[in-house]
Curated annotation (Swiss-Prot):
It catalyses: tRNA(Arg) + L-arginine + ATP = L-arginyl-tRNA(Arg) + AMP + diphosphate. It holds the Pfam family Arg_tRNA_synt_N. The gene is argS. This is Arginine--tRNA ligase. It is found in: Cytoplasm. It is an enzyme of class 6 (ligase).
Length: 563
């Protein structure tokens, strides 16, 4: 029970007219610390109790059980509550020390599955910064729900099917060289893709030729299938190397092609339920009753299936395979209309579990304010970006700590962590402008800043040769340590807020606040000086490092012990 819950519970005993949750929502943090740690305004009770707010405040202050608090006093219409800092700090530090990285673990999920549709790069195209957002947001959310007791299922829904393969086959047959592709597969395939798109803008017949090759691929043509498989295999080797660098793994790589033989069932169900209508030769599902203006296009007039048909097949397969409690689609904001249609069609098919599906959208990454585009060759590739971030991290580590052992491994953790953290600290619906200098900086609200705070604490603990005892009681009541204690106590609530809002930035911002609070404490407090509080101060350091490391782990970022 956190302090707000504790206060609300005590006030509710005195004022049964208000729900405990309402009381909790009304609690305020006074602007002046002399007015207490939290305050409850009595205005909302005036009408119900037919008394002046000042009298109500005085009544509550007199009747409330103050044994859990330092003191409770009425000031005008407010009940000001002063928390017992020594008692709370002892409780919080005791919990963190006893539970370690399991502090804030919960069993809300009770082992149920949550399926994450994530990353989903396109085969034969390089992995760009644009794909990073889906990958790291979903991976962080998967870690967060695992901490709540759910079992995340990470599904990489590869973009391994579609007209773009027709384009690529046309380009390869026109200009491609097997040796060039084998020597540098992704880069060579990208050049071919950009070149054929430029030609298609000038010559509409290229589009028709690409469509024809894709139709052959759908029909199982031997040459088309062999080229497609080769492009896919080469791309996956490259992608997996990058996923290893990012520290991200998947439970399934079933992409679009996996559902080729599973779409007929979708069309059959829609037909049997009388949901398909003809529109200009195409087969559609009308969704006007859901407030969706455009019908869902299931089959084109030439008989080709569409993206939504494939996603319907995928949803059915995943429900049967994983029996998910929730299915989370971490996909860009521009796909929001598609996911509204997807859920509505499933609802029409009679699958009420579609209510458990959520599109977790996110904003775009730009460069100098401009949208990135693989087709136009305006793209920031992830592999060279990681290499540059690691180099910059290593240069800063060399300057700060030239004799540090394992410099390369630590630079990798800092460089990769910097890129991931910068993405995750941004509210996901906001885009951000790519700025490697800002990402890798050790100052400001960055991953390296948080990692450095953790490494600094580990250095203090090594100097002191301190390991907390599970039997000891550690308590503090000074202002600087209290700021840290409040944050540590809030960590379980942070986890739940991040999960409820599908918002990893809540955890990232918490980590920044905790690092800032510790750095302020470090500047004001002589931690290692001999004094009665020394062990409690070191216990605070230990607890802070534990929670910082766990917050970073949830974000998929390493916390080196030295930097």
């Amino acid at each position: 029970m956190n302090t707000k819950e504790l206060i609300a519970a005590e006030i509710a005993k005195v004022v049964p007219e208000l729900e405990q949750e309402n009381i909790q929502n009304l609690l305020e943090i006074p602007k002046n610390a002399d007015m207490g740690d939290l305050a409850f305004p009595a205005f909302s009770l005036a009408k119900v109790l037919r008394k002046a707010p000042q009298m109500i405040a005085a009544d509550i202050a007199e009747k409330i059980d103050a044994s859990n608090f330092e003191k409770v006093e009425a000031v005008g219409p407010y009940i000001n509550i002063f928390l017992d800092k020594s008692k709370i700090s002892a409780d919080v530090l005791g919990q963190v020390i006893a539970q370690g990285s399991h502090y804030a673990d919960q069993n809300i999920g009770n082992g149920r599955n949550i399926a994450f549709d994530m990353s989903s790069p396109n085969i034969a195209k390089p992995f760009s910064i644009g794909h990073l957002r889906s990958t790291v947001i979903a991976d962080a959310l998967a870690n967060i729900v695992a901490k709540q007791g759910y079992k995340p299922v990470r599904i990489n829904h590869l973009g391994d099917w579609g007209k773009q393969f027709g384009m690529l086959i046309v380009a390869y047959k026109k200009w491609g060289s097997e040796e060039a592709v084998k020597a540098n597969p992704i880069n060579e395939l990208l050049q071919l893709y950009v070149r054929i798109n430029a030609e298609a803008e000038e010559d509409p017949s290229v589009d028709e030729e690409a469509r024809e090759w894709f139709r052959k691929l759908e029909a199982g043509d031997e040459e088309a299938t062999a080229l497609w498989q080769w492009f896919r295999d080469e791309s996956l080797v490259e992608f997996n190397r990058l996923y290893d660098e990012l520290g991200v793994s998947f439970d399934s790589y079933n992409g679009e092609a996996f559902y080729n033989d599973k779409m007929d069932e979708v069309v059959d169900i829609l037909t049997k339920k009388g949901l398909l209508q003809e529109s200009q030769g195409a087969q559609v599902v009308n969704l006007e009753k859901y407030g969706i203006e455009h019908p869902a296009l299931i089959k084109k007039s030439d008989g080709a299936t569409l993206y939504i048909t494939r996603d319907l097949a995928a949803a059915l397969y995943r429900k049967r395979t994983y029996d998910f409690a929730k299915a989370i689609y971490v996909v860009g904001n521009e796909q929001s209309a598609h996911f509204k249609q997807l859920k509505a069609v499933l609802k029409e098919m009679g699958y009420n579990w579609s209510d458990d599906m959520t599109h977790v959208a996110f904003g775009l990454v730009t460069k100098n304010g401009k949208k990135l585009s693989t087709r136009k060759g305006n793209v920031i590739l992830l592999e060279p970006t990681i290499a540059e971030a690691v180099n910059r991290a290593q240069a800063q580590i060399e300057a700060k700590n030239p004799n540090l052992p394992n410099k390369e491994a630590i630079a990798h953790a800092v460089g990769v962590g910097a890129i991931k953290f910068y993405d995750l600290k941004t509210d996901r619906m906001n885009g951000y402008d790519f700025d490697l200098d800002a990402m890798v900086s050790f100052e400001g609200e960055t991953g390296p800043y948080v990692q450095y705070a953790h490494a600094r604490i580990q250095s203090i603990l090594r100097k002191a040769d301190f390991t907390p005892s599970a039997d000891a009681t550690y308590s503090l009541n000074d202002v600087e340590s209290w700021e840290i204690i409040k944050l540590l106590q809030d960590f379980p609530r942070i986890i739940n807020r991040a999960s409820d809002n599908f918002e990893p930035s809540i955890v990232a911002k918490f980590a920044i606040s905790l690092a800032q609070a510790f750095n302020k404490y470090y500047a004001h407090t002589r931690i290692l000086d001999e004094s009665p509080e020394r062990d409690s101060r070191l216990a605070l350091c230990y607890a802070t490092a534990t929670v910082l490391k766990e917050a970073l782990r949830l974000l998929g970022v390493e916390a080196p012990d030295e930097m």
